Amino acid sequence: MASRRPKKPTKALMKIAVSGLLAGAGALALFGFYAEMQADAMGPEAATSLAAAIPTPASIRGYEALAQAALARQPLAPADLDLARTASLKTLSLDPGNVSAWNRLAYIDLADDGRLSRDGMAAIYKSYEVSPYGNPQVMMWRVDFATRSWTSLPDDIRRATLDQLPVIGGIYVTWDWRVETCRENPYPEIWQPICAATPGIDRPAAR
């Protein structure tokens, strides 16, 4: 007998899941597992409805899974951005110091219309407030993000970005990123200190 293909989540399944999650605190703990299993399978509109319907408190792990799955879709649709924004805000309602969620909100804002609005700027400010340096991945991400909108960033955000460069330069695991940044970043104030911190790597001559 041929094996059956797994069915995609239906509205009825979503209602059952939400009803169960609303039943009590113990059931809410299941949301993280459920979200990770279903985020890739359901459409962005359905997942957005699910994320919005589930009250706080619930699971940071689940909200993070929903946000990451939404932003992994290509090409990104408005519904994907809405889902990632909703899930990120849910994360922050539980953990206001979650730097990844603040970074995501800034990214979503920029992806929405190609420029940072007041909300996106507030999110990147908050990112630096809760984690001025953070782990290497956070710092490298913020430099790359700043590069995308460098000319429109206020001086204090540029300064905060540049202040991370000496720290990144002293971390061995950032080597590959430093090589790429030294060779490819268009802004001298970024690539010059990174090249200086990456011995043996030269920036190709301008053509």
Question: What do the PLM-derived regions correspond to, one by one?
Answer:
Residues 2-78, 82, 89, 158-207:
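N-terminal alpha-helical interaction modules that lie
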Residues 39-42, 67-78, 106, 110-117, ...:
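Short coil/turn linking the two alpha-helices of tandem helical-hairpin repeats
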